[in-house]
Amino acid sequence: MNECNVHKEGYNELNQYLTTTQSKIFQCDKYVKVFHKLLNSNRHNTKHTGKKPFKCKKCGKSFCMLLHLCQHKRIHIRENSYRCEECGKAFIWFSTLTRHRRVHTGEKSYKYECGKSFNQDSNLTTHKRIHTGQKPYKCEECGTSFYQFSYLTRHKLIHTREKPYKCEQYGKTFNQSSTLTGHKIIHNGEKPYKCEECGKAFSIFSTPTKHKIIHTEEKSHRCEEYCKAYKESSHLTTHKRIHTGEKPYKCEECGKAFSIFSTLTKHKIIHTEEKSHRCEECGKAYKESSHLTTHKRIHTGEKPYKCEECGKTFSVFSILTKHKIIHTEEKPYKCEECGKAFKRSSTLTKHRIIHTEEKPYKCEECGKAFNQSSTLSIHKIIHTGEKPYKCEECGKAFKRSSTLTIHKMIHTGEKPYKCEECGKAFNRSSHLTTHKRIHTGHKPYKCKECGKSFSVFSTLTKHKIIHTDKKPYKCEECGKAFNRSSILSIHKKIHTGEKPYKCEECGKAFKRSSHLAGHKQIHSVQKPYKCEECGKAFSIFSTLTKHKIIHTEEKPYKCEKCGKTFYRFSNLNTHKIIHTGEKPCKCEECGKAFNHSSNLIKHKLIHTGDKPYKCEACGKAFRRSSHLSRHKIIHIGIHTEETVQK
């Protein structure tokens, strides 16, 4: 057949040549493939018909070729198994053992031009198809094509809905034997894969491989742009696309481009609207029956996955896995910059962006940039105004499901995260982490401009604006500008007079939820925050922080006009109005203007006649709390005189 390489024009010329030179040529009707023997041709055709005449008596598995059955039988015999000296794992074929050994050596001799390397030539061949777009394996049922034959085999089960592998313990079925094997480990708690470095054990073989990277701190592939380093060149190649804006993976359906291939794969699901598994309760549809099974638990309230440590139950196994970390308190992933430790490597990766200040994800609508794609997705909802997550208890709607979950705790009163130091409880683990810094005094977030440190990152972000003097958020009503959108929102309430936060105890209303929280302490008389310097106690921690400045005599906020210094930035802002003569807060009743909203609020009481501050001793009411305080001295004097007379 060597002389046939001259016939490159096509199949017809090759066929003509073979017919004249060979008397026994057998051809495949489906593809351009030729055979010298009828037996070989018949064997090959069996693949296309789907017939599997050769059956294993031991397990019932069928094959299209006798050779494949003979190879399969060795699984049951296991006489000539080849064992790995490194981990003890046994293999039927020596070639499989050779491939497996590369897991331990880390050898990846098959390299492609994009920088990615592989330990098997078959993996390289499959990877090449990503770049070429070649998908040789096509589903006859729906026409979907795949890079790998194994993907096609798995895909076919969607049409047949066949799940032949069943868990004997729970009855759950799977379409792959490997998935069943992995699932079984969940029940028996077996962790056969151990890290030689630290002794940590894992239930899945691939997990210790990922875990080992923690110990090997070698990151030889460095980004020239931001000096970020990676262990693999392929990861660096992907990272560089953030700076270049390159998006080589394009969706054929809508034209949308992506920088990562896996993101394109996830995106494609949007276009394939096949959702055959529908919930009878609410009508929601899913592509997979397992997703429907999980969804149904919302209606039934079933929570089959129980935590052995605290007894808490969950509807999804993955949530139980995440929950278990609370009890271990293990945080193996540490930030080299600030020393903060994390339970997951993905969380550490997200955290690192704080130090680099890199914001690669930009909103096309308003130009605002973010350090996480998830934050950008959440931000986009601002422009659409969509709030799909609604509270069944009070009807309030939210942009995020996580915000709804946290909101629900208001109705239940649940605060599962408790501080061991002072007993204070929180509804979020992140709030507990932040709270703990009060006791430790840890301030990991430092301002590069002035060196001031903060315990919360958001406080650092707010602080940075002091150095820039930028005020992008302007009030349309009075023209006043602010450096934060949240302050503008609060300011707007001056014009509207809106006070949505009401005290259930006395009926007093507030513009801010934080003001209501502070006010509530009046009724409880609880003052858990004590000053170590003078012993004075406070109901709010922020008030203690402000108070501490008195002892240090530090006044970091200086007026450029007259040189006067202040403890607080807000006091400086209030003071500045003296020089400008600005009076933005106007009374709608009489037209009188004030330089501060608090003065306007006090003034309004003249028109309403409202006297909210009442003396408990004699019942006399006052417009201002300061007037009530002065009045109380009268009773103290009377009480003293009565005591002396007695």
Swiss-Prot record:
GO terms for cellular component: nucleus. Keywords: DNA-binding, Metal-binding, Nucleus, Repeat, Transcription, Transcription regulation, Zinc, Zinc-finger. A zinc finger (C2H2-type) spans 26-48, 54-76, 82-104, 109-131, 137-159, 165-187, 193-215, 221-243, 249-271, 277-299, 305-327, 333-355, 361-383, 389-411, 417-439, 445-467, 473-495, 501-523, 529-551, 557-579, 585-607, 613-635. Coiled coil: none annotated. GO terms for biological process: regulation of transcription by RNA polymerase II. One of its GO terms (molecular function) is DNA binding. InterPro entries: Znf_C2H2_sf, Znf_C2H2_type. PROSITE patterns: ZINC_FINGER_C2H2_1, ZINC_FINGER_C2H2_2. May be involved in transcriptional regulation. This is Zinc finger protein 493. It comes from Homo sapiens (Human).
